[in-house]
Amino acid sequence: MKNKSFMDYRKIVMEVCCGSWRSAVKAIEDGAERIELCQALSVDGLTPSMNVLRRLRAKYPGVRIHFLIRAREGDFVYDDDEVAIMEADIREAVEAGASAIVCGALTPDNDIDTAAMRRWIAAAQGLPVTFHRAFDHVRDPQAALEQLIELGVARVLTTGGRMPDGTIATTAEEGIPALRALVEQAAGRIIIMPGCGVNNDNARRIIEETGAREVHGTKLNKKIWQKQNGLAAS
């Protein structure tokens, strides 16, 4: 049983959220297997420079770079022009070497904007798509998850979102019960990736209590995490 747990932990994916060229380089040099590239983390991330993506891809051709598409801060309800702008950004990111696209849109009623998502998924030209933390604000997480599965979205980045009492989890630790329910509902059809406040100290608890196999954070280092937990480096 111990060996099974060991092997499972070696397969955990830690995605490091990087808000600049320097933070991306540091994460990669520290051994990050995958990064999410964005900017303006103070407003929960915006679309970063395409030239940063191009330079990272040239310098680190083997690193998986998930690229955030978010045109502005604030809510996730976008008009037709904003949808078109982000559609064009996705196409450019694909050409610039992104490994996957991170995006998300909601309707005014806080449901998944399936029309926008279909356009963006098509623009991704077969690259995996992550639905970002707009998911935290959907009014019906279970129904929204089924919609994303039907759309072909690869993963959802979330704190767990809306809790049974109607409040929205502000961190992944707080949202553990909701995350566990989402992982169970997903049943391998889509990846549930806990994010917000995930670090080397609490990642193991979040993984064990939710069943998630990918986590996301700005302060993750898999090598340090494995050492802290007595696990061999992968």
Predicted regions and their residues:
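N-terminal amphipathic alpha-helix/helix-capping segment at the start of soluble metabolic enzymes
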Residues: K2-C17, A58
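Hydrophobic faces of well-ordered beta-strands that scaffold small-molecule active sites
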Residues: I12-V16, I35-L37, I65-I69, I101-C103, ...
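N-terminal beta1-alpha1 ligand-phosphate binding loop
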Residues: V13-V25, D30, E36-A40, D44-G45
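Catalytic cores of alpha/beta
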Residues: G19-K26, D30, V77-D89, D136-L151, ...
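Active-site-adjacent beta->alpha loops and helix N-cap segments on the catalytic face
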Residues: W21-R22, L41-R64, D81-E82, L106-Q125, ...
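Glycine-enriched alpha-helix->loop->beta-strand junction motifs that scaffold or abut catalytic
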Residues: D30-I35, Y60-V63, G97-A100, A123-L127, ...
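Glycine-rich phosphate-binding active-site loops on the catalytic face of alpha/beta enzymes
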Residues: E36-L46, E92, A96-P108, V153-A169, ...
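Structural motif corresponding to the early beta-alpha repeats
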Residues: R54-E92
